[in-house]
Amino acid sequence: MTDPVLVANGLVRRFGDLTAVDDVSFRIEPGETYGLLGPNGAGKTTIISMVAGLLGPDAGETRILGKAIGPGVVSAKAHIGLVPQELAIYPDLTGRENLRFFGRLQKLGGDQLKRRIDEVLTVIGLEDRGGDLTKEYSGGMKRRLNIGIGLLHQPELLILDEPTVGVDPQSRNSILKSVEALAVSGMAVLYTTHYMEEAERLCDRIGILDHGVMQAEGTRDELLVLTGETDRVHLEGTGNLEAATTALRRLGAVKSVTGDRRNIERSGCDCPCGG
């Protein structure tokens, strides 16, 4: 049996009197896209900071390929590509020059780096725009280049922190297509979002977070099963279903709960796609 790429076990993180993350556990298998779904303030960014080794937990641990992760553990971090919400690109460099710069920071060079830049530009759909200055890029193109930087060193796990924030619907769709291409390539991805339809589209399994607690976890079919023309969904899976329902309401993804089986009527899409 193949070992998981990532195991997070009992993560707790406090900031003063605030418990931002409270006993969160999950794992990511090879080739799996795992989504952390929750409203702003749910604890998503704190979790990925711990997973990436930027922030130490107050309790619990994370392991990638069996190696413990934490601040200062360089060997484990080499397996992770972190793509934060903030853009890490230089506007007066071309897309290709940005990738070359960050590749050299990661100790890549020569023909290996050139080949890898070509591969990354193809994966993110910018093979025809790699020679353009990034200040001429659209918001979505900049986001995709940001993803490309995280891919350069061929990590076993790519972490994407809300990569579609602040972009128009067309750009957003292009970003999602790039993430789908990563899934086809077999890369493991940890994807955070507060858009439920993004999680449904991209993720093999989804963890629903609210107030730092994992309220429910499961596959798309386990968590949200569409029931045809009634435009209703059925919430299943493990965890506190009532709390998960509350979290989904806060996301604007549901508007009513009826019956013992907790059938949930979907509201209109809350994402920027206009749905």
Region roles according to the model:
Residues M1, V21, E119, G228-T230, ...:
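Short, solvent-exposed coil/turn segments
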Residues M1, Y137, L223-T227:
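Generic marker of residues within folded, mature protein domains
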Residues D3-A8, R13-A216:
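ABC transporter nucleotide-binding domains
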Residues L176-S267:
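ABC transporter nucleotide-binding domain
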Residues G268-G275:
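Low-complexity basic/metal-binding stretches
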